[in-house]
């Protein structure tokens, strides 16, 4: 019998206990289930999140504009560099006047028309992130200093796009490729297809 080994990374919320269920199913439809209980160790403390502040992302009409973000280090990339480093790309910005989504932040795995970002649908690695809109003051956002808080705020499955963005909008998100939780806030929006957006991101290390 072949042995299957898989590393799994879990993010603990502030709940005292959580039950995680694993289901393993083979090609014949046979399955086995394993449940584990994860308890919160309050003595372990929390972890400081990482901040990427004042990131400027260009819309798709800006020549050689940097529309893509790697959440591993906050680097911004243009379309060509992003296409050459697909596995590193987690977020992107564009202006959508087709579906009336206008200023939008999504991930490569979202459904984005090829007329907006050429070639994206043909990427072999299209990481996904999901987003939940939050109501939060600027002071509260900039005071975030807890990874547990970031995990707690993403309490349900989010949407594939953060759309119709306005200054002050705040979103909780999950980087599904790396199983990391974070939040971003919109600080500035300029223009449309030839414009840009300025955001700050706080994320689990």
What residues fall within each predicted segment?
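Surface-exposed, beta-sheet-biased, low-hydrophobicity segments with strongly acidic/polar composition
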Residues: 1-7, 11-19, 29-205
């Amino acid at each position: 019998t072949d042995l299957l080994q898989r590393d799994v990374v879990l993010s603990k919320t502030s709940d005292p206990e959580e039950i995680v269920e694993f289901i393993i199913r083979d090609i014949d439809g046979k399955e086995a289930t394993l449940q584990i209980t994860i308890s919160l160790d309050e003595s372990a403390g929390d972890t400081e999140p990482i901040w990427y502040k004042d990131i400027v992302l260009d819309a798709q009409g800006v020549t050689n504009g940097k529309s893509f973000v790697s959440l591993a280090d906050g680097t911004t990339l243009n379309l060509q560099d992003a296409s050459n480093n697909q596995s590193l790309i987690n977020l992107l910005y564009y202006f959508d006047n087709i579906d009336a989504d206008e200023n939008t932040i999504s991930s490569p795995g979202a459904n984005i028309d090829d007329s907006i970002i050429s070639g994206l649908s043909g990427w072999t690695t299209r990481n996904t992130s999901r987003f939940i809109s939050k109501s939060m003051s600027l002071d509260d956002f900039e005071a975030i200093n807890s990874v547990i808080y970031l995990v707690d705020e993403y309490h349900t499955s989010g949407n594939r796009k953060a759309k119709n963005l306005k200054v002050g909008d705040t979103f909780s998100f999950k980087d599904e490729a790396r199983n990391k939780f974070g939040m971003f806030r919109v600080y500035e929006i300029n223009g449309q297809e030839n414009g840009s957006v300025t955001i700050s991101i706080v994320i689990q290390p």
